[in-house]
Amino acid sequence: MTAPSQVLKIRRPDDWHVHLRDGDMLKTVVPYTSEIYGRAIVMPNLASPITTVDAAIAYRQRILDAVPAGHDFTPLMTCYLTDSLDADELERGFHEGVFTAAKLYPANATTNSSHGVTSVDAIMPVLERMEKLGMPLLVHGEVTHADVDIFDREARFIDTVMEPLRQRLTTLKVVFEHITTKDAAQYVRDGNDYLAATITPQHLMFNRNDMLVGGIRPHLYCLPILKRNIHQQALRELVASGFTRAFLGTDSAPHSRHRKETSCGCAGCFNAPSALGSYAAVFEEMNALAHFEAFCSLNGPQFYGLPVNTGWVELVRDEQQVPENIALADDSLVPFLAGETVRWSVKK
């Protein structure tokens, strides 16, 4: 029996789904991502969503201004799709290298999504343009109808929105983001090379019992919501299989402590500080460390048609405690796994 690895050396990873927010929050959270990842797909759901090239350029600069000296980090900007978005504006942003992808939020599916798309038909001309451009569509895959149970929203989305869309636009590149169900895992596995998925650390590590049994744990509350154990296991098996169209997307989504620990708390896990080590722990538990680098560093660039990062990151088997909180100007952030010990940490 061989001794377990003490060091994991991988190509520098990318985060294909992150929320960096704005203002003081942005300045606080950006370094946790820029220190580790070469690139990150930045979500556009600010209070005033990023729907124009100029807005994306300005936001990108605010992000870059928050990157500490010595960090080599490139934010990849996305356009927030709305019913009224101009396809020419989207194409201009893509050709000018401002927009890497566009994001489809069903209206009111998650934080700051009230401006989202009311129906796919409303944006079909934009999606047709994206298909011609080879521009990826990033999808929050949940229906938001009041009569659909929150635990069924993803599976229903596949049947009523995702599959009809992909039948209609057969060469549109689609990333099914933060998948949470065995239905989505099977759907992506059965799909063609134009369909990929991101998976978060929390959906690999936890299920809804972890959030709800023995007291409500608001810092595990995110959208899409944690599902049953059978769904968690399906996600773990997907990544452990070495499936090449699944890749790292933390969906790190910071909210101040008082907005999480309240009678009507916000959805989102701020997992940037511990995400890479969390993924490593899952792959180790699944005896799948041979596929860890591809998930973190190779599969995403392959799908997006981008080069693999040239640098390297080392994780060491060195137990460290995640901070209980991180200071904000007028509050604090409670990170994912706060106060808990993680067995893999990034070598500084």
From Swiss-Prot:
GO terms for molecular function: dihydroorotase activity; zinc ion binding. One of its GO terms (cellular component) is cytosol. Pathway: Pyrimidine metabolism; UMP biosynthesis via de novo pathway; (S)-dihydroorotate from bicarbonate: step 3/3. It comes from the Bacteria. It catalyses: (S)-dihydroorotate + H2O = N-carbamoyl-L-aspartate + H(+). The modification N6-carboxylysine is found at residue 103. This is Dihydroorotase. It comes from Salmonella paratyphi C (strain RKS4594). The gene is pyrC.
